[in-house]
A protein has these predicted regions:
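Conserved helix-loop functional segments at active or binding sites
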Residues: 91-100, 121, 125-128, 171, ...
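CN hydrolase (nitrilase-like) catalytic-core segments centered on the catalytic cysteine
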Residues: 1-57
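ATP-dependent adenylation/pyrophosphate-handling site
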Residues: 100-106, 110-147
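Catalytic P-loop NTP-binding/switch module of NTPases
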Residues: 51, 58-85
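Short acidic, glycine/serine/threonine-rich loops at helix termini
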Residues: 2-6, 34-39, 113-118, 132, ...
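A conserved beta-strand->alpha-helix junction
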Residues: 57-64, 127-132, 136, 140-184, ...
Length: 195
């Protein structure tokens, strides 16, 4: 949950205040079925974290308690933590199931760009194949964006035009339904990509 870290810090800080001591907290890192553990083991004082490991990375933390300023607090970027959680979730899922490669659709849009970025971070760009499935509704700009993204990420691509499938399906539907609405034709492209 997005606010889990803040709730955890508050609970540990309250415990540290009650104990009048610094609390050492240890948490596992990685995915386990549908759960993703962020790690973030460290020392917590009554005002929050004093020092902790980065989230979603297996590592150790050496603490010089004599030099520790107990008034310092650790701040993190929420967006970076979400990205790290998604990356480790995908990486651990693949590792635990023995998967080494992924195939995903590249449309040139933001959704497929984010999925491709996370997959490349998680399992390596060389292990992610981006498939472009253009039809008459695919603009040159979208195709160019998808290819540019793949090149920048270092992932291979394959283009499989679906225009012939689209035309045949549209004609079959028009025989029984009459002329299709433009939005129906655009949605037909998306449905064909899912086949």
């Amino acid at each position: 949950a997005k606010n889990q870290q803040a709730e955890r810090e508050k609970a540990i800080a309250n415990f540290a205040k009650e104990a009048k001591s610094v609390i050492a907290y240890c948490n596992q890192t990685g995915a386990n079925t549908e759960l993703i553990f962020d790690g973030k083991s460290g020392l917590y004082g009554e005002n929050g974290p004093l020092s902790h490991t980065p989230g979603f990375v297996s590592c150790s933390l050496d603490i010089n308690t004599a030099a520790l300023d107990c008034n310092d607090q650790v701040k993190n970027s929420g967006e970076e933590e979400v990205l790290q959680a998604l990356t480790i979730g995908v990486r651990d899922y693949f590792q635990k199931l023995g998967f080494t490669r992924a195939i995903l659709g590249l449309s040139g849009g933001l959704d497929s760009a984010l999925v491709a970025y996370i997959a490349c971070r998680a399992i390596g760009a060389e292990n992610v194949l981006g498939v472009l499935l253009p039809s008459e509704f695919s603009s040159d700009h979208s195709v160019d964006d998808a290819l540019t993204l793949a090149r920048r990420l270092g992932m291979p691509t394959k283009t499989l035009p679906i225009q012939a499938c689209f035309t045949q399906t549209r004609e079959s539907l028009q025989e029984s339904q009459g002329r299709l609405q433009p939005v129906t034709e655009e949605n037909l492209q998306a449905r064909l990509r899912g086949l």
